[in-house]
Amino acid sequence: MRSMRALQNALSRAGSHGRRGGWGHPSRGPLLGRGVRYYLGEAAAQGRGTPHSHQPQHSDHDASHSGMLPRLGDLLFYTIAEGQERIPIHKFTTALKATGLQTSDPRLQDCMSKMQRMVQESSSGGLLDRELFQKCVSSNIVLLTQAFRKKFVIPDFEEFTGHVDRIFEDAKEPTGGKVAAYIPHLAKSNPDLWGVSLCTVDGQRHSVGHTKIPFCLQSCVKPLTYAISVSTLGTDYVHKFVGKEPSGLRYNKLSLNEEGIPHNPMVNAGAIVVSSLIKMDCNKAEKFDFVLQYLNKMAGNEFMGFSNATFQSEKETGDRNYAIGYYLKEKKCFPKGVDMMAALDLYFQLCSVEVTCESGSVMAATLANGGICPITGESVLSAEAVRNTLSLMHSCGMYDFSGQFAFHVGLPAKSAVSGAILLVVPNVMGMMCLSPPLDKLGNSQRGINFCQKLVSLFNFHNYDNLRHCARKLDPRREGGEVRNKTVVNLLFAAYSGDVSALRRFALSAMDMEQKDYDSRTALHVAAAEGHIEVVKFLIEACKVNPFVKDRWGNIPLDDAVQFNHLEVVKLLQDYHDSYLLSETQAEAAAETLSKENLESMV
């Protein structure tokens, strides 16, 4: 009988997936130290949770089925409400934006539409009580919980964006660069435009400056077109027609490598050849539409336009590119049967595709996220294509400044004569900068300055030492309050009656039953001090164990009795009864489950 009990216990432990310190019963606390913690831990293990998995994350059905939603929803509500009975919607959206998420995020569409509908249908005046709040957030609970637990790639997003804004202002000073004039339509660009947008791999967004003004991708489309080609055709096939090495020459030179193919996809000759590989069996319109659909997916279906004026201007004044096209044709660089003029037309069209800094930053973030769009969760590009693309951007993406940029900045990037710089911090974020004045090598002067200042402050350089680079900031590290989540903070919050701090600790998955050297818990301290609201939070929201004994053998109820806190005594006595009942029910359920598991094994 004893061996059977041991086997059942082992199965019960396996069923609770590696619980910590006997947290197998779903009714026992702490809230995020049991089933909820396991669920969130699993979500975090699968690519930092749901924000950028391979499928769009619009709803969290698994959490709903496992019965965890009400408790997670409650904790989110308590954290944002800070003791109030109802939450103004604007307070929720403000708190949401502080995490980096936008109300327009496609993943939150269901949540935001429910909130809007609730406001219209109810007479609450834009206030959500706990029940309404749960209904609104239930389909996005895991994403929202991760956001408020600061479990995104950049935990303290407000602090990080504050630094970015200061760098933006520092780089804003007049540069002395000149707007590109060899394409007549580009010569009309406003030299005062200056904008920067970023999007992390978790979908955190920030923009500063002129980030909603459309501009042509120009050469920034080259790495994107190459990535699409490799995703659809494979690396080996694409590199039969284009090389991988920096040329050491100007981007528009009539030059081939020793194998008789363009040096790389980032020079004009290479980009024209790559354009010729796309959908070779289709007509011009179908080819352009095919690439545009890919670009739209990379941008999370955000703004994408087309400048016909730029396209016509390119065609009328693109003598150098026509010369390159005929040179490639003469050297038989195109696949058999390719129409050289059609390839040039597609190249001109793709250079004339318009984005904004905001939509461009999502495209860059898709590259940073291994080909998966962070705001839709859709897998757009293969991991192989992204790896190859970033490698070539690192070595060849900045014209004749590529070596210097790799040395000083150490990140994959691509510049364009429109004044754009598409910058990728792999596994962290993508950025798009826009400032039309160019330096003598054809790169945005403000953009280069911004990138250099960014890497001088943060340890984003490819070869920065992440452990010992003390002089640089690492925004990926949890800081401040999160770094100091110790039993001292927990017990001090209980001692001082700081329910808001306790809510934050619980939401960040802290074990609310931690003990000090006297084996006293937060519930002991709150009961001894008579903090009724703290006791309520610990027993109602966190479901902590009220029978933990300190080194003198006292449970929290004993402390409340000793210090004559009668309200706390009554509250704890009632909780003892309900806790024992729920524990008995949970043990019975676990016993039944173990028997079923044994029977299925037999």
UniProtKB/Swiss-Prot annotation:
InterPro entries reported in the protein's UniProt record: Ankyrin_rpt, Ankyrin_rpt-contain_sf, Beta-lactam/transpept-like, Glutaminase, Glutaminase_EF-hand
Control of this protein's activity: Enzyme activity is not stimulated by phosphate. Phosphate increases kcat, but decreases substrate affinity, resulting in unchanged enzyme activity.
Region (Disordered): 1-29, 45-66
One of the protein's GO biological processes: reactive oxygen species metabolic process
Coiled-coil stretches: none
EC class name: hydrolase
Pfam families membership: Ank_2 (PF12796), EF-hand_14 (PF17959), Glutaminase (PF04960)
Chain positions found as N6-succinyllysine: 253
Main localization category: mitochondrion
UniProt xrefs under Gene3D superfamilies: 1.10.238.210, Ankyrin repeat-containing domain, DD-peptidase/beta-lactamase superfamily
Modified residues (N6-acetyllysine): 279, 284, 329
Classification via PROSITE patterns: ANK_REP_REGION, ANK_REPEAT
Keyword field: Acetylation, ANK repeat, Hydrolase, Mitochondrion, Repeat, Transit peptide
One Gene Ontology term of the molecular function aspect: glutaminase activity
Reactions mediated catalytically: L-glutamine + H2O = L-glutamate + NH4(+)
ANK repeats (start-end): 518-551, 552-585
Keyword Ubl conjugation on entry: no
Family label: Belongs to the glutaminase family.
Function: Plays an important role in the regulation of glutamine catabolism. Promotes mitochondrial respiration and increases ATP generation in cells by catalyzing the synthesis of glutamate and alpha-ketoglutarate. Increases cellular anti-oxidant function via NADH and glutathione production. May play a role in preventing tumor proliferation.
NCBIfam families: Gln_ase (TIGR03814)
Subunit structure: Homotetramer, dimer of dimers. Does not assemble into higher oligomers. Interacts with the PDZ domain of the syntrophin SNTA1. Interacts with the PDZ domain of TAX1BP3.
Name assigned to this protein: Glutaminase liver isoform, mitochondrial
